[in-house]
Every structure is written in C-alpha cells, then in structure tokens.
C-alpha cells in the first residue's frame, strides 16, 4: 500500500505509477485517523500556525510526566530524535493540519484550536471556508469530548455552538479565558516568563503559577497556554508541566538558533 501526503497530487510520477500498477492508495491523514482510533485519548492540535510548536510543548510536558505518549509532530523534536515516537500508553498526540481538510479524517477525543486565519487559499475559497472546515473538525469530537480554543479568535463560539463538548478557553483576556497570562516579561533573548491565571486568578499555590519558557515571543505564551490547558485536562501535575516547558528549546526550523554571525 502507498501512503501519500496532502502535498502529493495525481500528476506526481510515483503516485501515477502506483495507480497504474493497481497498488492500494491511502492518504496520510486517513492512516493517522485509523491509528488514533485505537487510543483511548487522542489529542489533535490545529491552527493556522503554532501547531508544531504547541504539539512539541505538550509532548515535552507528557515526557516530563512519564506519560509515555505516542507522538506525531510536523517537525523534528530533538528529545525524541525525530518526528515520531511510539509510546506504550493509551495516549496519542498529533498536530492536525487543515490543508485539503486532512484533519477531518482524524478521530480525536480532545481538539485544540490555536488560531484560524487565511491560509492554503489554493484549496480553500476564503476565510469563511476555512472557518467552516475548523467547525467540522470540532464536530469530529465525540459527545463530551474536549475542545481547547483561543478566545482571541473572532466569534470563537461559532466553532462549538450547539455541540455537546467541554470547552476550555485560553487567550489574552482573563474575563473570557479559562487560562491566561499576567505579568509577561522577557529576558534579553526574548524568552518569556509569566504568571499563569485560571479564571482570572493565579493558578495553584505559591510558585505553581510561575511559568518560564525557553522559546521567545508572545505567540509562544499563547501556544504554551494551550499546551498547559491540555496537560491539566489530562491530569498532568503542574510540576511536570513547568519542567516540560522549561526544558523545551524549540523544534528544528521553527525560529531555530543556527549560530552567531561573525561569532
């Protein structure tokens, strides 16, 4: 059987030869959907951007907690030596791409939506078409499944309105976000420190709410909030969450440090 990605089109020579030879064909998204259907918990991380980083953040947290997850990520995560890890637990974590509606082949129990913006307009007609695809992605959740969504997305309630799912929000506004950040500060490399809020109040006791990131930028604050929300929903201790985030230095080709010019 030949498995092909959304980047491969029917005019690809190898694809065309497989068709001529009568070899069974399967889209990569369909294969992933079949695999995750065998897991009790399947976490899908979607969004126009931030998927690889957030999937990697959550993976580092789960590894720090010895949760032994199976991981499929769209970049190279150094701590697993690639982009795939086969675990022995009943937990599957993957990034979920909207291109060609690939994520509609998945079988999630928890979905994360980081943002929804104009992208892949060679496939989607417009932003409304993209939003409709993400709505169908949420509809893939089972009754009582969990949706973690950024409340900064315009009309974010559209994505879950009328559905029987548990909704957890993250974002910049503590008044409409289950999890948000306060006192965001940066070091000289742009790496972030912040206080984690739950329903507008510092999370936990003492230093439990103090979060340190080793990756720069405000966007990674929001990526980390989504990863934290997912981890807490999976009953991961806050100590493991803090440890995993503090040990995450990014993935290859995502603002990757390559060296110092004339250094």
Task: Please place each PLM-identified region on the residue numbering.
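Cytosolic ligand/metal-binding cores
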Residues: 2
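Phosphate-binding loop of NTP-binding sites
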Residues: 6-151, 155-166, 225, 229-234, ...
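Adenine nucleotide phosphate-binding catalytic loops in nucleotide-utilizing enzymes
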Residues: 124-131, 145, 161-263
């Amino acid at each position: 059987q030949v498995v092909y990605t959304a980047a491969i089109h029917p005019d690809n020579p190898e694809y065309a030869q497989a068709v001529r030879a009568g070899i069974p064909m399967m889209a990569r998204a369909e294969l992933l959907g079949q695999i995750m259907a065998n897991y009790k918990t399947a976490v899908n991380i979607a969004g126009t951007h931030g998927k690889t980083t957030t999937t990697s953040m959550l993976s580092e947290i789960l590894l720090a907690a010895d949760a032994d997850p199976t991981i499929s990520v769209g970049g190279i995560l150094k701590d697993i030596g690639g982009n795939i890890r086969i675990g022995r637990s009943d937990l599957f974590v993957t990034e979920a791409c909207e291109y060609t509606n690939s994520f509609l082949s998945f079988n999630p129990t928890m979905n994360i939506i980081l943002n929804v913006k104009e992208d892949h307009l060679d496939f989607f007609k417009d932003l409304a078409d993209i939003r409709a695809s993400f709505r169908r992605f949420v509809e893939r959740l089972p009754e009582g499944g969990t949706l973690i969504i950024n409340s900064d997305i315009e009309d974010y309630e559209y994505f879950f309105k009328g559905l029987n799912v548990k909704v957890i929000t993250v974002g910049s506004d503590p008044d409409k976000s289950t999890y948000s950040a306060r006192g965001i500060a940066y070091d000289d490399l742009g790496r972030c420190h912040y206080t984690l809020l739950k329903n507008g109040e510092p999370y936990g006791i003492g230093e439990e709410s103090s979060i340190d990131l080793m990756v720069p930028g405000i966007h990674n604050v929001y990526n980390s909030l989504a990863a934290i929300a997912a981890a807490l929903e999976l009953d991961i201790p806050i100590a493991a969450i803090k440890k995993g985030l503090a040990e995450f230095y990014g993935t290859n080709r995502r603002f990757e440090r390559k060296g110092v010019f004339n250094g």
